[in-house]
């Protein structure tokens, strides 16, 4: 499977990996699967790893993916999103996606290394858990 995911309900995180020749239809199918997954509910962070993806998304496709994120907001409220992209071209495309998807997350950030992405998510979650519960994107 080019797009796989695992939901850690206790850790409140979706870990998604894109590998191989991922296409837009497969990414959109991933969001349909999340929509139907009973574990995909509440407030969740996202760790997206695209280091093994072999096809660079087109800029025009990033808007469609961002819209898919927005379509499942009634079911799940995404909090923080860390994206891991090691290659220069993919890193740049994910920075562009960061702009498209920013309105659906408290914060989105792109990293080159998984451990740095995980550390950032942990720091964001710790700060969030000690702060009031309103979502800044709701205002």
Model segments located where?
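Amphipathic, Lys/Arg-enriched alpha-helical "gate/interface" segment within cytosolic domains
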Residues: 1-139
